[in-house]
């Protein structure tokens, strides 16, 4: 019997490969994305200190939108505004092993439009 590969396990393997190559510092932190079935989360992380500097998710009251993609772009805008307020302009984008498409792409483009460089 042919079994399908577990999508989340392959994503985790892909994420581990990417994380081996990138890490965030205080000068250029890492913008991490996590996507669940209902929500999307974004964090700006300083890996040297092991501290989350800024975060946003669809659970925040500032986030609006009807579709999941609209909500993701709203999360990107909110996390970018919060990062710029803290003086963070340049980040390294960590897509979390997800394909750069759909909600992840919408979040990244909204973050770029609102002042983050990556």
Curated annotation (Swiss-Prot):
Q: Provide the GO biological process annotations.
A: translation
Q: Which GO terms describe its cellular component?
A: cytosolic large ribosomal subunit
Q: Which UniProt keywords apply?
A: Ribonucleoprotein, Ribosomal protein, RNA-binding, rRNA-binding
Which SUPFAM superfamilies does this entry report, sorted A to Z?
Translational machinery components
Q: Which Gene3D superfamilies does the UniProt entry name for this protein?
A: 3.30.420.100
Recall the GO molecular function terms of this protein's record. 5S rRNA binding; structural constituent of ribosome
User: Cell inner membrane as a keyword?
Assistant: no
Q: What job does the chain carry out?
A: This is one of the proteins that bind and probably mediate the attachment of the 5S RNA into the large ribosomal subunit, where it forms part of the central protuberance.
**What family does the Swiss-Prot or TrEMBL record give for this protein?**
Belongs to the universal ribosomal protein uL18 family.
How is the subunit organization of this protein annotated in UniProt? Part of the 50S ribosomal subunit; part of the 5S rRNA/L5/L18/L25 subcomplex. Contacts the 5S and 23S rRNAs.
Its recorded name reads Large ribosomal subunit protein uL18
Record gene name:
rplR
